[in-house]
């Protein structure tokens, strides 16, 4: 059984900070679950251009409001607490948090991330094999 406390893990190297967001990676590849699980905060007013070419992601909004735009269709969806979206086609997208407050999101990645990934210029994490080959 794996038990982790967000309030404690936020103070460890499981917390990753970047421009416009921070994330606490509660489950990673080494945990052997077949997916990774993160609590991610999108900073108020952030606009993030992302494209997870090598991962599928599902996201559930717990706090805050914003929107996600599917760059293939141009369709924009409002995000608020209780809304889930899934990037089931490695969808290129723009995620926006409204200016008033951050959004707190619960995120699941498949395949799981290792915890060492950083977003590339294209907004993607590298494939696990590419990450291992660069180590």
Swiss-Prot record:
HAMAP family tied to this protein: Ectoine_synth (MF_01255)
Keyword annotations from UniProtKB, A to Z: Lyase
InterPro entries in alphabetical order: Ectoine_synth (IPR010462), RmlC-like_jellyroll (IPR014710), RmlC_Cupin_sf (IPR011051)
Known catalytic reactions: (2S)-4-acetamido-2-aminobutanoate = L-ectoine + H2O
The keyword DNA damage appears for this protein: no
Domain of life of the source: Bacteria
The protein's Enzyme Commission number: 4.2.1.108
Family per similarity comment: Belongs to the ectoine synthase family.
Keyword Transferase listed: no
Source organism per UniProt: Hyphomonas neptunium (strain ATCC 15444)
NCBIfam families cross-referenced by the UniProt entry: PRK13290.1
Top enzyme category: lyase
An example molecular function term from Gene Ontology annotations: ectoine synthase activity
Pfam family, one: Ectoine_synth
One record GO biological process: ectoine biosynthetic process
Function: Catalyzes the circularization of gamma-N-acetyl-alpha,gamma-diaminobutyric acid (ADABA) to ectoine (1,4,5,6-tetrahydro-2-methyl-4-pyrimidine carboxylic acid), which is an excellent osmoprotectant.
Record-given protein name: L-ectoine synthase
SUPFAM superfamilies attached to this UniProt entry: RmlC-like cupins (SSF51182)
Gene3D superfamilies named in the record: Jelly Rolls (2.60.120.10)
Pathway listed: Amine and polyamine biosynthesis; ectoine biosynthesis; L-ectoine from L-aspartate 4-semialdehyde: step 3/3
């Amino acid at each position: 059984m794996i038990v982790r406390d967000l309030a404690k893990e936020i103070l460890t190297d499981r917390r990753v900070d970047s421009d416009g967001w921070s994330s606490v990676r509660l489950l990673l590849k080494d945990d052997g679950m077949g997916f990774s699980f993160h609590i991610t905060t999108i900073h108020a007013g952030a606009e993030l251009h992302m494209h997870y070419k090598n991962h599928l992601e599902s996201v559930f909004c717990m706090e805050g409001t914003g929107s996600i735009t599917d760059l293939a269709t141009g369709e924009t969806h409002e995000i608020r607490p209780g809304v889930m979206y899934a990037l089931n086609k490695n969808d290129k997208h723009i995620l926006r948090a409204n200016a008033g407050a951050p959004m707190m999101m619960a995120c699941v990645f498949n395949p799981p991330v290792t915890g060492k990934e950083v977003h590339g210029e294209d907004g993607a994490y590298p494939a696990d094999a590419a990450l291992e080959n660069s180590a």
